[in-house]
Amino acid sequence: MNTKIGLSLSEKYYWSWKTKTSNCPCFSCSGEGNIVINKVSGEKYLQYNLTYLKDIWAPLKELNLEKQFDIIALVRGGGLTGQTESIQLGVARLLCQMNPQNRSVLKPFGFLTRDARIKERKKYGLRKARKAPQYSKR
């Protein structure tokens, strides 16, 4: 029994993924449909934002598996939106790991696609990444 996350090694699935600047190892096991993020309930961690919760459950709803699995995620870095996207991607990859036939159902909805956009760095001489100081001709 892995006491750190409360799962035995024989009944859990694991996948780790990154989105933007957030990193999210996800674990899944059979259960009643609970979400635990960083050892806190998912609703409380995501500040009771229903949009974030729907995004996490979307891959499971497409496969009609909402009440069959518990999701445990350990998220680091980024904001709540980036963390939610990385959890969603981790859940979708877990479902493909459990059953490779799920890939054909999840792929058209974009659940298996990583959003590769990241923040552009600030360049010297500029105020932000691309914002230049005002130009004066004379």
From Swiss-Prot:
GO cellular component: chloroplast; small ribosomal subunit
GO biological process: translation
UniProt GO MF annotations: RNA binding; structural constituent of ribosome
InterPro entries according to UniProt: Ribosomal_Su5_D2-typ_SF, Ribosomal_uS9, Ribosomal_uS9_bac/plastid, Ribosomal_uS9_CS, Ribsml_uS5_D2-typ_fold_subgr
Keywords noted in UniProt: Chloroplast, Plastid, Ribonucleoprotein, Ribosomal protein
Pfam families with a match to the protein in the record: Ribosomal_S9
Presence of keyword Ribosomal protein: yes
Entry keyword annotation includes Ribonucleoprotein: yes
Location(s) in or outside the cell: Plastid, Chloroplast
PANTHER family named among the record's database cross-references: RIBOSOMAL PROTEIN S9 (PTHR21569), SMALL RIBOSOMAL SUBUNIT PROTEIN US9M (PTHR21569:SF1)
Family, similarity comment: Belongs to the universal ribosomal protein uS9 family.
Protein name, as recorded: Small ribosomal subunit protein uS9c
Protein's organism: Trieres chinensis (Marine centric diatom)
Classification lineage: Eukaryota, Sar, Stramenopiles, Ochrophyta, Bacillariophyta
Gene: rps9
